[in-house]
Amino acid sequence: MSMQDPIADMLTRIRNGQAANKVAISMPSSKLKVAIANVLAEEGYIESVKVLDGVKPELEITLKYFQGKPVVESIQRVSRPGLRIYKRKDELPKVMGGLGVAVVSTSKGVMTDRAARQAGLGGEIICYVA
Protein backbone atom coordinates (compact mmCIF):
# COMPACT_ATOMS: atom_id res chain seq x y z
CA MET A 1 0.00 0.00 0.00
CA SER A 2 1.30 3.46 -0.87
CA MET A 3 1.81 6.30 1.58
CA GLN A 4 -1.15 8.71 1.70
CA ASP A 5 0.70 11.86 2.82
CA PRO A 6 4.49 11.77 2.29
CA ILE A 7 4.96 15.35 3.58
CA ALA A 8 3.25 14.53 6.89
CA ASP A 9 5.50 11.45 7.09
CA MET A 10 8.58 13.66 6.56
CA LEU A 11 7.51 16.10 9.29
CA THR A 12 6.78 13.20 11.66
CA ARG A 13 10.21 11.69 10.99
CA ILE A 14 11.82 15.06 11.87
CA ARG A 15 9.70 15.34 15.06
CA ASN A 16 10.44 11.74 16.12
CA GLY A 17 14.14 12.00 15.22
CA GLN A 18 14.57 15.04 17.44
CA ALA A 19 12.57 13.45 20.28
CA ALA A 20 14.96 10.47 20.13
CA ASN A 21 18.04 12.77 19.88
CA LYS A 22 19.05 11.30 16.51
CA VAL A 23 21.92 12.97 14.64
CA ALA A 24 20.38 12.37 11.20
CA ILE A 25 17.25 10.86 9.67
CA SER A 26 16.60 9.49 6.19
CA MET A 27 13.50 8.99 4.09
CA PRO A 28 12.48 8.46 0.45
CA SER A 29 13.25 11.60 -1.57
CA SER A 30 11.03 13.80 -3.75
CA LYS A 31 11.41 17.29 -5.23
CA LEU A 32 8.89 18.77 -2.78
CA LYS A 33 10.54 17.14 0.26
CA VAL A 34 13.96 18.46 -0.83
CA ALA A 35 12.50 21.96 -1.34
CA ILE A 36 10.88 21.93 2.13
CA ALA A 37 14.08 20.63 3.74
CA ASN A 38 16.11 23.37 2.01
CA VAL A 39 13.75 26.04 3.39
CA LEU A 40 14.12 24.56 6.90
CA ALA A 41 17.92 24.54 6.50
CA GLU A 42 17.96 28.19 5.30
CA GLU A 43 15.87 29.21 8.31
CA GLY A 44 18.24 27.36 10.67
CA TYR A 45 15.85 24.65 11.87
CA ILE A 46 17.96 21.78 10.51
CA GLU A 47 21.73 21.43 10.01
CA SER A 48 22.00 20.08 6.45
CA VAL A 49 20.22 18.30 3.60
CA LYS A 50 21.70 15.58 1.38
CA VAL A 51 20.16 13.57 -1.44
CA LEU A 52 21.70 10.10 -1.69
CA ASP A 53 21.35 8.79 -5.25
CA GLY A 54 20.53 5.19 -5.97
CA VAL A 55 17.75 3.07 -7.41
CA LYS A 56 15.41 4.85 -4.97
CA PRO A 57 16.86 8.27 -3.98
CA GLU A 58 17.05 8.88 -0.23
CA LEU A 59 16.84 12.26 1.50
CA GLU A 60 19.13 12.56 4.53
CA ILE A 61 18.51 15.39 6.98
CA THR A 62 21.02 16.24 9.71
CA LEU A 63 19.09 17.52 12.72
CA LYS A 64 20.09 20.57 14.77
CA TYR A 65 20.25 20.94 18.55
CA PHE A 66 21.03 23.93 20.80
CA GLN A 67 22.38 23.22 24.29
CA GLY A 68 21.13 19.65 24.01
CA LYS A 69 17.57 20.65 23.08
CA PRO A 70 16.01 20.33 19.60
CA VAL A 71 15.87 23.60 17.64
CA VAL A 72 12.42 22.67 16.26
CA GLU A 73 9.94 23.14 19.11
CA SER A 74 6.91 22.29 17.02
CA ILE A 75 6.33 21.27 13.42
CA GLN A 76 2.74 20.98 12.25
CA ARG A 77 1.18 19.96 8.92
CA VAL A 78 -1.46 22.44 7.74
CA SER A 79 -2.59 21.67 4.18
CA ARG A 80 -3.17 17.97 3.67
CA PRO A 81 -4.44 15.77 0.82
CA GLY A 82 -8.01 15.74 2.19
CA LEU A 83 -8.14 19.48 2.94
CA ARG A 84 -5.88 21.83 1.01
CA ILE A 85 -5.32 25.25 2.61
CA TYR A 86 -4.54 28.17 0.27
CA LYS A 87 -3.97 31.78 1.32
CA ARG A 88 -3.53 35.03 -0.60
CA LYS A 89 -0.45 37.18 0.11
CA ASP A 90 -2.36 39.41 2.55
CA GLU A 91 -3.84 36.37 4.36
CA LEU A 92 -0.51 34.57 4.99
CA PRO A 93 -0.28 33.73 8.72
CA LYS A 94 2.45 34.84 11.13
CA VAL A 95 3.48 31.81 13.17
CA MET A 96 4.01 32.62 16.87
CA GLY A 97 3.80 36.34 16.10
CA GLY A 98 6.62 36.12 13.55
CA LEU A 99 8.99 33.94 15.64
CA GLY A 100 8.15 30.79 13.66
CA VAL A 101 7.73 30.26 9.93
CA ALA A 102 5.01 28.96 7.67
CA VAL A 103 6.35 26.98 4.71
CA VAL A 104 4.38 28.01 1.61
CA SER A 105 4.27 26.40 -1.84
CA THR A 106 3.90 29.23 -4.37
CA SER A 107 4.00 29.48 -8.15
CA LYS A 108 7.67 30.53 -7.77
CA GLY A 109 8.59 27.52 -5.59
CA VAL A 110 8.60 26.61 -1.91
CA MET A 111 9.47 29.49 0.46
CA THR A 112 8.73 30.96 3.88
CA ASP A 113 5.69 33.13 4.57
CA ARG A 114 8.05 36.12 4.94
CA ALA A 115 9.61 35.57 1.49
CA ALA A 116 6.17 35.01 -0.09
CA ARG A 117 4.87 38.25 1.44
CA GLN A 118 7.90 40.17 0.09
CA ALA A 119 7.44 38.62 -3.37
CA GLY A 120 3.71 39.41 -3.28
CA LEU A 121 2.73 35.75 -3.64
CA GLY A 122 0.13 33.55 -1.99
CA GLY A 123 -0.04 29.78 -2.11
CA GLU A 124 -0.60 26.52 -0.29
CA ILE A 125 0.40 26.52 3.40
CA ILE A 126 2.38 23.29 3.79
CA CYS A 127 3.34 23.49 7.47
CA TYR A 128 4.11 25.67 10.49
CA VAL A 129 7.52 25.42 12.17
CA ALA A 130 8.50 27.04 15.46
From Swiss-Prot:
What Gene Ontology cellular component terms go with this record?
ribonucleoprotein complex; ribosome
Tell me which PROSITE patterns the record gives.
Answer: RIBOSOMAL_S8
Tagged with keyword Signal: no
Listed under GO biological process in this entry are:
translation
- Keywords in alphabetical order: Ribonucleoprotein, Ribosomal protein, RNA-binding, rRNA-binding
HAMAP family listed in its UniProt record = Ribosomal_uS8_B (MF_01302_B)
What family does this belong to?
A: Belongs to the universal ribosomal protein uS8 family.
Entries under PANTHER family matching the protein: 40S RIBOSOMAL PROTEIN S15A
Q: How does it assemble?
A: Part of the 30S ribosomal subunit. Contacts proteins S5 and S12.
The name this protein carries in UniProt is Small ribosomal subunit protein uS8
Q: What is the lineage of its organism?
A: Bacteria, Pseudomonadati, Pseudomonadota, Gammaproteobacteria, Pasteurellales
